[in-house]
Every structure is written in C-alpha cells, then in structure tokens.
Swiss-Prot record:
Keywords: Ribonucleoprotein, Ribosomal protein
Subunit structure: Part of the 50S ribosomal subunit.
Protein name per Swiss-Prot or TrEMBL: Large ribosomal subunit protein uL30
MF (Gene Ontology): structural constituent of ribosome
Native source species: Arthrobacter sp. (strain FB24)
Record GO biological process: translation
InterPro entries reported for this sequence: Ribo_uL30_ferredoxin-like_sf, Ribosomal_uL30_bac-type, Ribosomal_uL30_CS, Ribosomal_uL30_ferredoxin-like
Amino acid sequence: MAKNLIPSDVQLEITQIKSAIGGKQNQRDTLRSLGLKRIGHTVVRTADAVTVGMLNTVPHLVKVEEAK
C-alpha cells in the first residue's frame, strides 16, 4: 500500500518489517523521523504530505495499513 498513498486525513499504522542496517543514511534517518526504532515497532501517523513522502522513501522497509 505504501506506493499508492495520497495525502489525506486518514490515520496510518506504520510497522518496520526490515532492518535499516546496510541501507543508505537517508533511509535510516527517515525511519527514525517516522518514530520507528526496531523491527516490529508500530507507530500511528496521519497521512499528510510529509508522512507520505517519507513512506515513499522506505517502502521496502515498512508495512503500511489503515489504522482501525
């Protein structure tokens, strides 16, 4: 779902599913900015333009679902 996101007022559950070790520095910084610290860690963020842009940077490291 991370590739088809558009900015809106929807709440997103973002879960880190892969490690940032060996990744580029900007990808590690993006995960930290999203509030993700370890594999399996989940945060809830609004799908604003900033968050969608960050998710488009690391789609291979996170799983995105609509929050319930």
